[in-house]
Amino acid sequence: MTSSIKITDNSRELNGPVSREKLSSILNEIFNKDEPIPSSVELVLAQLNELSSKHKFIVNVTKLNANNVNTADFSVDSYIGSSWNDKSDGAFHYQIPLGSGQPDTKRILLVSVYWILL
């Protein structure tokens, strides 16, 4: 039995200070290094702050570990409510599969980036 995780992005458009492609590139580059997650979050925030001084950013990371991919059964639901301006504020959710030293182990990071225009 093979398990798979699918992340759906329900956002209609990415109206942030960075393109979807650029943000994906930043997240892949930083989180695929062998750094502790808190350090990686700080690096992402530093790059985002360089790209826009007009926004505040929040980065949330959820790490999923499956010790046995044949029996892993994940179900993760996450919801957020906001009272922000849909034209200038928003969120981006991204999945990053991580390499593993063991073939029967699956590790995935679920990364959410939120921004609010000042």
From Swiss-Prot:
Places the protein is found: Cytoplasm; Cell projection
InterPro entries in the record: Tctex-1-like_sf (IPR038586)
Keywords: Cell projection, Cytoplasm
Keyword Nucleus in annotation: no
One cellular component term from this protein's GO annotations in UniProt: cytoplasm
Main location: cytoplasm
Family classification: Belongs to the TDA2 family.
Protein name: Topoisomerase I damage affected protein 2
Species whose genome carries this gene: Kluyveromyces lactis (strain ATCC 8585 / CBS 2359 / DSM 70799 / NBRC 1267 / NRRL Y-1140 / WM37)
